[in-house]
Amino acid sequence: MAVKENNQGACKRKSAEDLQHFVRNDFKKRSALGDLTNIPCATRCNHYSKCNLSPLKSAKVENPQIYESYDSKINEYLHQLERKRKNSIAVDYMERIQSDVTPAMRGKLVDWLLEVADEYSLQSRTLFLAVNCVDRFLSSSTIKRQKLQLLGITCILISSKYEEITPPSVKELCDITDNSFSKDEVVKMEATVLNALRFEMGNPTAVTFLSSITAVALGDFKEFGLQLETLGCYIAELSLLEYGCLEFLPSLVAASAVFLARFIIRPARCPWNAELEECSGYEPRELKSCVLLLYGCFIRYGRGIIKPSALIPNHYFL
C-alpha cells in the first residue's frame, strides 16, 4: 500500500515537473526585438514568471482570523478599482488611436517582454503591470512602430521600479535591445510614459486576482495543486499576448484562466462551483467568451503542454 501511494505521489510530482519544464524549455540568450514590419503574431508564450500566487499564505495559516477579516474588504476594493479604471485602456485603440502599430506587432512586443522578464527573473506582477502600462500608453498616445520596443523596455523599467527590490538598470535594458536606444532616450521616454499615465501605477491586473481565486480552486483540486497553479499562471500570461483580451476586466481574465486550467487538467469534472462563483463574483456564463478566447490561445501557443479536449461542453457554462 505504501509503495502504491509513493508511486502515485511520484507520478503527480513528475507531471507537475513536466508542466513547469515545458513553459521554461525554450529559454535562450535574449536578443533585440528586430523589425516589426509585417511581423506575424508571436508563435507562443515561452515564459514562466515567478507568480508567487500566495505571498501571505504562511502568515494566513498562522493567523487565519486576522487575514480572513481583511480578505473580503481587499477583494471588494480591488474590484471597485478595476471598474473605476476600466476606461484607462481603450479596447479599440489599434483602430482609433494607432495608425502605424498593429495587434500583431503588439503581440510580438509582448512576447519579447515575456522573455525579458524571464531573463531578469522578474515577478509576474511586474510583467503584467508593464504590459498594462504599454496598453494604457497606446490608448492615449500615438507611436511609430520604430519606437514600440523603446516603449516596451521603458514600461519594464517603470514597473520594475514599482514592484522589484532590485530592478534592472537602464544600461541593462539598453543592452538587451542591442543598444538600439540610448540611456538618454529611455530616461526621456520614462518621463513621457509616466506623464501620459498620470503617474497612476496601482492598476489591478489579472495576476492581482489570480491568488485568491486559485486558493479557492485548490479546495477540491488538492491532488493537482501544483499543476493548477502552474497552468493557471501560464494561461493568464497567454492572455497578455491576445489583444482581444483587453475587452475583459482583469478579474474576469483571472477567473477564466482558473476555469480553463481546471478543465484542461480534469475535463470530465465541471470546472466551476459555488465557492469559485462567490470568490470571483462571476457565474460561468459570464466567463464563456473569455474562456473560449483563452482556449484558442492555449491551443495555438501551448502545444505539447497537456493534450486538450476538443471542445468545452456547453453545459459547463450554464
Segments from the language model and where they lie:
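Acidic, serine/threonine-rich low-complexity regulatory regions at protein termini
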Residues: M1-I153, L157-L318
